[in-house]
Amino acid sequence: MEEVEISTEKKSNPVKSFIAGGVGGMCNVLVGHPLDTIKVRLQTMPTPPPGQPPRYKGVIDCAARTFRYEGFRGFYRGISAPLVGVTPIYAVDFAVYAAGKRLFQTDDHIRLTYPQIFAAGALAGVCSALVTVPTDRIKVLLQTQTVSNGPLLYNGTIDTAAKLYRQGGIRSLFKGTCACILRDSPTGFYFVTYEFLQELARKKSANGKISTTSTILSGGTAGIVFWTLAVPFDVLKSRLQSAPEGTYKHGIRSVFRNLMATEGPKALFRGILPILLRAFPSTAAVFFGVELTNDLLKA
């Protein structure tokens, strides 16, 4: 079984990881939100009537239309929800990951196996998903309402949260919880990929230190691995969270059946191009922010 040496001081302090994760999460949103908006709009556009073209022809067309009708601000529509929620989401993710690794560590330089890293990462994914759901629900509604045929129903994050609560209570805010947990279930692969590449960079380094470039490359690659596995669940989540109440009576199962019946398996990968285009820079930004904060806290 392959093992990787991870310092408890640097990698497995839940309190420091909580702070570093929050900073990394904010870096993620600032870098990745424009492509996230395009991704959500492609995933949630309705099936066109027979003989009619789809609302968007692809990533470039969606980006061009967004800029033409909404300007630069259109790409950052709904950003306040993830920015407000991103600190606890990523803070929980990295804190639980650190706590999970600590469970396997008995001293400051215990060698963890990759299955142990995977287990800690998977646990972190489930816990952070529970925090993610309300902000994801609000973000998706704000990102998609401007391209619907009806009037604007929501005016910002607080207004959306208040209206959702009035409509269906806490349950409405947490619509799509199961789908979100499934979407974040590959988090174990995310952390394994990152730790493996960082350890590889450390071994190849003359002084045993990891450069900023290595952190960016490792983080970006981890993001691509994660999202390649998560895309189908993300499509189902976006469809469910953007649909009017009562559209899918059995939740994610109803979304899946409807999607297969009307659009086929190909629809599960709708929006994959902007997802993968966004995955590298946004995830690289996460780990850059995390490692920079870890270094500052260690100083």
Swiss-Prot record:
UniProt KW Signal keyword: no
InterPro entries from the UniProt entry: Mit_carrier, Mitochondrial_Carrier, Mitochondrial_sb/sol_carrier, Mt_carrier_dom_sf
Membrane topology, from the record: Multi-pass membrane protein
Alphabetized Pfam families for the sequence: Mito_carr
Effect of a null allele: RNAi-mediated knockdown results in accumulation of magnesium ions in mitochondria, and reduced lifespan. A magnesium-deficient diet rescues the reduced lifespan phenotype.
An MF annotation (GO) of this entry: magnesium ion transmembrane transporter activity
Annotated Gene Ontology cellular component terms: mitochondrial envelope; mitochondrial inner membrane
Keywords assigned by UniProt, alphabetized: Magnesium, Membrane, Mitochondrion, Repeat, Transmembrane, Transmembrane helix, Transport
GO annotation (BP), single: intracellular magnesium ion homeostasis
Solcar repeat ranges per the UniProt record: 12-103, 112-200, 210-296
Keyword Transmembrane helix: yes
Primary localisation category: mitochondrion
Bilayer-crossing regions: 79-99, 114-134, 216-236, 272-292
Alphabetical list of Gene3D superfamilies matching this protein: Mitochondrial carrier domain
Record localization: Mitochondrion membrane
Record's function text: Mediates efflux of magnesium ions from mitochondria, suggesting a role in magnesium homeostasis.
Family stated for the protein in its record: Belongs to the mitochondrial carrier (TC 2.A.29) family.
Name the record gives this protein: Mitochondrial magnesium exporter 1
Gene this protein is translated from: MME1
